[in-house]
Amino acid sequence: MAYDIISDIHGCYDEMIALMQKLGYEVKDGTPVHSEDRTLVFAGDLTDRGPKSVEVMRFVAKAYEKGAVRYVPGNHCNKLYRYLKGNPVKVMHGLETTAAELKELSPADRTEVSRQFIRLYESAPLYDILHNGDLVVAHAGIKADDIGKYSRKVKEFVLYGDITGETHPDGRPVRRDWAAAYEGKAWIVYGHTPVKRPRIVNRTINIDTGCVFGNQLTGFRFPEHETVSVESSMPYDASRFREDHGRQA
């Protein structure tokens, strides 16, 4: 089995479809199908900030229920899940756009989409170990020693990265560069922190190329170790991208 991993779609449905087509998938009855033995893996943060979060939710949930794709959650997925379950969350940092889309639906459609996403989230693994352990897909990454573990500390790392507890002036959390110290044998494919180009450090690759911030949506082909990207239709926001340190794909 070969895999095509996509991360941080953030409601950019049109770019998601374009990238799938570029990767060789054809959508049949709402399900992505490849002529070769390949499977799509979504690495979290399906929604928020972009224009079509509900469409992304519907598409991934339906395909996942059919067993056609794999999915692991991101921090935005976690927050949306808690919001849909009625837990108290701050409707900000992008969630407000998804909430607004949901409110535009009829009550019946809103209930259906919410239930679809809740089922998706509750049935998904925290991270995915694939290809006989040679590949791990985790939204914000994972340390080599934590692969196979599922503690609260590991969950926080996988969803939010290696946060220090400090914040940047704009409110974003300060994160350590865990990839620079990674010495594991498995390839870790992750996103979460926008970079202008896919960032390869040791056996890790960050494929969040900031589609929702006007750059690109990127897929990583494994075991080929190739990246495929499509351009974003969103306005470009240079302030959202971290400095690149490491080899660019």
UniProtKB/Swiss-Prot annotation:
What cellular-component terms does GO give this entry?
Answer: cytoplasm
Q: Which cofactor does it need?
A: Ni(2+)
Task: Please write the reaction equations for the catalytic activity of this protein.
Answer: P(1),P(4)-bis(5'-guanosyl) tetraphosphate + H2O = GMP + GTP + 2 H(+)
Give an example GO molecular function: GTP binding
Q: Which InterPro entries match?
A: Ap4A_hydrolase (IPR050126), Bis(5'-nucleosyl)-tetraP_PrpE (IPR023937), Calcineurin-like_PHP_ApaH (IPR004843), Metallo-depent_PP-like (IPR029052), MPP_PrpE-like (IPR041780)
What keywords sit in the KW lines?
Answer: GTP-binding, Hydrolase, Nickel, Nucleotide-binding
What enzyme class is recorded for this protein? hydrolase
Q: Which CDD domains match?
A: MPP_Prp_like
Highest taxon of source: Bacteria
Q: Which SUPFAM superfamilies match?
A: Metallo-dependent phosphatases
Q: What is its EC number?
A: 3.6.1.17
What does the record give as the function of this protein?
Asymmetrically hydrolyzes Ap4p to yield AMP and ATP.
Q: Which family does it belong to?
A: Belongs to the PrpE family.
Q: What is this protein called?
A: Bis(5'-nucleosyl)-tetraphosphatase PrpE [asymmetrical]
The protein's organism comes out as Bacillus velezensis (strain DSM 23117 / BGSC 10A6 / LMG 26770 / FZB42) (Bacillus amyloliquefaciens subsp. plantarum)
